[in-house]
Design a protein with these regions (language model features):
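A general structural signal for short secondary-structure junctions and capping/turn motifs
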Residues: 28-31, 102, 124-128, 169, ...
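Short alpha-helical segments and helix-capping/turn motifs at coil-helix boundaries
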Residues: 23-26, 115-122, 161-165, 338-342
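Single conserved hydrophobic/aromatic residue that forms the stacking wall/gate
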Residues: 1-16, 378, 383-387
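Substrate-binding/active-site clefts of carbohydrate-active enzymes
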Residues: 90-91, 101, 138-314, 319-345
Length: 387
């Protein structure tokens, strides 16, 4: 995609807010179903003030439901120059990098206007908390190690829904699987430089998009439908699906990391910056940055992502990685934080299982037992929360 008039953003964002706080966004005009696009944001380059706008860099829509491309690789699957993803000059981080990176940038694809997946009267199992037996697993690891999974399905969502693995879970008495991160991710630069990837997946870059590397069938419909089929299969077996979600940080890492999406769209809005030096990021996560959930726009994005996974993908709950980060204000943990208030107020999200990992590496970071309750109940709710 190339740069267009900024007023075109309303065509892309007619169902959700623009991701840009300060500055303006450029987006393609009149996008149809299946169109591939990226965003460019105009604004000041002033890292010392927290601004990192660089219109030479094509940016991923944070509301993308499918990510086209892979960080570190070109469209043909060949390794790309990682410095092309940097917003700053690789030799002097105080200056912007003026090289256009559209050829290798991560892009979004416009989803179909109407869902076509047949859920076949899918119903949420709604297992009461007191009877929940939760089994944490990794999509790739669990399906590669089980001897009953055909080789073609190993490492995939389809493999996780295979009868051999479903029967194994039932035999163990599992009522709820907790999937380690399945959001589309960006493997950290330092790992790629060593020929490695982030196996565990705690480096999300698109909160509404499933990770395509776990799909047997490529393409938007293939990835989405394969994940939905997995959920439908587990529900038929009476097993809930909970997602391990990473909203405490993004895969853009620290100030020397890539500019893939949020950093280039509105760095000062999306991230918690060091008060005395806004060119640097507060790092309560140990992963280089922290999302700023005191900002209404950031809470909107996270809530939209959660609602998408419940309404469209039929998941039954979430486990929040490093949950205290989601409730920090001025550096302190706040049980009345805006994000928790948004969860309690949301008719859909207050019905599902919500699990908090109770620590981060910030001050007073261990908060076990100090997370507020939500209005989750099994006595008055219907069997399906998808409407």
């Amino acid at each position: 995609s190339t740069r267009k008039e900024s007023s075109a953003a309303s065509d892309v964002y007619k169902r959700q807010p623009s991701p840009v706080g300060e500055g303006s966004v450029d987006a393609p005009l009149r996008l149809g179903e299946g169109a591939v696009y990226g965003l460019r944001a105009q604004g000041p380059w002033a890292p010392h003030q927290g601004h990192r706008f660089n219109p030479a860099k094509l940016l991923l829509d944070p509301y993308a439901r499918e990510v086209v491309g892979r960080y570190g690789f070109d469209a043909q699957g060949r390794e790309a120059d990682l410095t092309l993803y940097l917003g700053h000059d690789p030799h002097d981080p105080t200056w912007p990098d003026e090289r256009d990176n559209a050829a290798v940038a991560l892009k979004a694809r416009v989803p179909a206007a109407a869902p076509v997946f047949d859920w076949q009267d899918d119903r949420a199992p709604r297992v009461p908390p007191g009877r929940t037996v939760l089994y944490e697993l990794h999509v790739k690891g669990a399906t590669r190690l089980h001897p009953g999974i055909p080789p073609a399905l190993q490492g995939t969502y389809a493999g996780l829904g295979h009868p051999a693995l479903v029967s194994h879970l039932q035999a163990l008495g599992v009522t709820t699987v907790s999937l380690m991160p399945v959001h589309a991710r960006a493997d950290e630069q330092r790992l790629q430089q060593q020929g490695l990837s982030n196996y565990w997946g705690y480096s999300s870059i698109a909160f509404l998009a499933p990770e395509p590397r776990y799909a047997q069938t490529p393409g938007q419909a293939g990835v989405q439908d394969e994940f939905k089929t997995l959920v439908r299969t587990l529900h038929r077996a009476g097993i809930e699906v909970v997602l391990d979600v990473v909203f405490n940080h993004s895969g853009e890492t620290d100030e020397l990391g890539p500019t893939l999406s949020l950093r280039g769209l509105a760095n000062r809005l999306y991230y918690v910056l060091e008060p005395g030096d806004p060119s640097r990021y507060v790092n309560w996560t140990g992963c280089g940055n922290c999302l700023d959930l005191t900002q209404p726009r950031v809470v909107e994005l996270v809530v939209a992502a959660l609602r998408h996974w419940v309404r469209e993908m039929h998941v039954d709950g979430f486990r929040f990685d490093l949950a205290p980060v989601l409730a920090r204000s001025g550096g302190r943990y706040d049980a009345c934080a805006p994000f928790f208030a948004a969860l309690r107020a949301d008719e859909l999200l207050s019905r599902v299982k919500l699990i908090a990992e109770p620590w981060d590496i910030g001050p007073d970071g261990y908060q076990l037992g100090r997370f507020p309750p939500v209005s989750y109940t099994h006595l008055t709710l219907p069997t399906t929360p998808y409407v």
